[in-house]
Amino acid sequence: LQSSIKGKSVFISGGNGAVGHLAIQLAKYRGAKIITTARPDKTERLKDLGADVVLDYTDNKLDQKVLECAPNGVDLAVEVEFGENIEMIPKIMRPMGTVCVYGSGKNMNPKFPFGDYLFKGIKLDIILVYLMPLSVRAKLIKVIHDAYTNNALFPSIDSVYGLRDCAKAHEQVMKPGRNGAILLKI
C-alpha cells in the first residue's frame, strides 16, 4: 500500500504462486519494474502478466542475477517464503528498502541475520490480512478493486470444489506447483 511504486524495482518471490501471480499484476498496474522468480517453464506466463524479468528460483547465483537487473538493489520485495530466502533478501535490497513478508510456510522459525538487515536499514512489513485494521484493509480492497475494474487484474483459478469436498480442496491448497487459487463453491 505504499503511496507510489511507479518506476520502483520490485522483487516478487514465487511469481507463479497465487500471491505472486496477483502481486505481479498489481505492481505492474501501479507502474513498477518487476523481477520475479519461478521455474523456467513459467517464464512466458509471468511475462504475459507483467513481469519484466523472470529468474530461476533454484539458481545458486540468484542474488547476483537480481542485482544485474537492479544494480542499486530493489526498492521493495514481496516475500512468500521468508525463511527460505532470509539470507538472500538483504543482498538484493537497496538501503532503506521494504520487504513485505506474506509467508514462510517452509521455515516458520528461521535464524535471523539481524546485522545484514540492520546495516541496510531494511524495513520488514509482515502482512497478515486477518490482523489488518479495517481502515488499512479497506484501502487494500480499493486498490484491488480499481485494478480489477480496469482490467489489470486476472485472478488465476486452479480448481473449484463443492463444499462436500472441502477436505480435498484443502489437500490441493497444500500441493506445490498449482496454478492459482482453490475455490469452494457454496
Residue ranges and their predicted role:
Residues 14-15, 81, 104:
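NAD(P)H cofactor-binding loop motif with strongest signal on the N-terminal glycine-rich segment
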Residues 55, 75-78, 100:
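N-terminal Rossmann-like NAD(P) cofactor-binding module of classical short-chain dehydrogenase/reductase
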Residues 61-72:
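Short amphipathic alpha-helix with an adjacent loop that forms part of the alpha/beta core around
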Residues 84-152, 186:
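Glycine-rich phosphate-binding loop and adjacent beta-alpha segment
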